Each structure stands twice: as structure tokens, then as C-alpha cells.
């Protein structure tokens, strides 16, 4: 097991926001490549948020795989348990639908938002039932100004209300 000398993504958010775009995109590419590797093995993370370790020099590693389950688990199970940190949980999961690969993509959109804001999504609100309802009605974090349009468009696609419209 590798030691994460630079802590977690969450503990480095303020530094990440200050990074040049090329570094942010390199880090996000590293994260989505790790998630793709999990998905290629037909697993769903189910608790994807700032639990990403910064091993060294922009080499990131997804951690906290304790709730990770095979895709088939949700296809054959009536399990409607909700795992994770509220703003990172996809709206369809909050409505009782099973986790899917696209649920993790929704979570990735919140990580994208953290990279440009430096704070947790909805950091100034209680993580409660009302926020769950609001997310299910389409509430998303406020778009930060002066962010490249292509980045915003991708982030919005990843947090689309319809999981079938999210990139995979």
C-alpha cells in the first residue's frame, strides 16, 4: 500500500483551486481514469467523494472502497440503502433507485465542482432531508464565474438529472 504523504483531496482543496488549469485537468483525468478502471471491472464505488488520496506530484488514488459493489449486486437486489455524502449522492439514488455506474459519474461532477470552488458542494447548508428533496428537484451548486465553458458543459452533463444523459 502506498503512503499518501500529501493527504486527501479534501485537505488540499484550497491548493487545488489555485492550480493552473493544466494541473487541475491532469488531476481530474487521473481521478476519472481510476473510476473508469473500477467501472471496467464492473464495480460501482457507491461512496465517491473527496476520498481521493494525493500520493505525490498530482498522482491521485481513489480510496474508501468499502461500499464498492459489483454492478450485478444492484441488478439482482432489492437493496435501496443510500450510502455516501449527501451532495455526492445522485438524485435517482435519493429517490430509491439502485446505484449505477452513472451514479458515480454524478458524484464525479461534484468533485469537478470542488476543484473550481475550493469548498464542499452546499457547504453553507445542512445536509438534511430538505437538501435531499432539493437535489431531487434539480438543485445543483452555483456555477462559478470565469470557468471555461467546456468545463461547465461537461460538469453539467455529469450532474444531469437523467442518468442516461450522463457520460460514461
Protein language model features and the residues they cover:
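Catalytic-loop of the protein kinase fold
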Residues: 39-55
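Activation segment of protein kinase catalytic domains, centered on the conserved DFG
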Residues: 14-29
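Conserved short submotifs of the Hanks-type protein kinase catalytic core
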Residues: 2-8
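A conserved short helix/loop substructure at the end of the activation segment
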Residues: 159-168
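Conserved activation segment of eukaryotic-like protein kinases, specifically the C-terminal portion
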Residues: 78-93
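Conserved catalytic-loop aspartate of Hanks-type protein kinases
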Residues: 104
Amino acid at each position: 500500500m502506498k503512503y499518501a504523504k500529501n493527504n486527501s483531496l479534501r485537505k488540499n482543496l484550497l491548493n487545488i483551486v489555485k492550480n493552473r488549469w493544466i494541473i487541475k485537468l491532469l488531476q481530474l483525468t487521473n481521478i476519472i481514469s481510476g473510476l473508469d478502471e473500477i467501472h471496467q471491472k464492473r464495480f460501482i464505488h457507491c461512496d465517491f467523494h473527496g476520498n481521493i488520496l494525493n500520493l505525490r506530484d498530482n498522482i491521485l488514488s481513489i480510496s474508501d472502497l468499502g461500499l464498492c459493489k459489483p454492478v450485478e449486486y444492484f441488478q439482482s437486489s432489492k437493496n435501496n440503502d443510500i450510502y455516501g455524502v449527501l451532495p455526492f449522492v445522485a438524485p435517482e439514488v435519493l429517490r430509491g433507485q439502485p446505484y449505477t455506474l452513472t451514479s458515480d459519474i454524478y458524484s464525479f461532477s461534484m468533485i469537478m465542482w470542488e476543484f473550481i470552488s475550493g469548498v464542499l458542494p452546499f457547504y453553507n447548508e445542512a445536509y438534511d432531508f430538505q437538501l435531499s428533496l432539493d437535489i431531487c428537484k434539480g438543485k445543483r451548486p452555483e456555477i462559478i464565474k470565469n470557468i471555461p465553458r467546456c468545463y461547465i458543459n461537461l460538469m453539467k452533463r455529469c450532474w444531469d438529472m437523467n442518468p442516461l444523459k450522463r457520460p460514461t
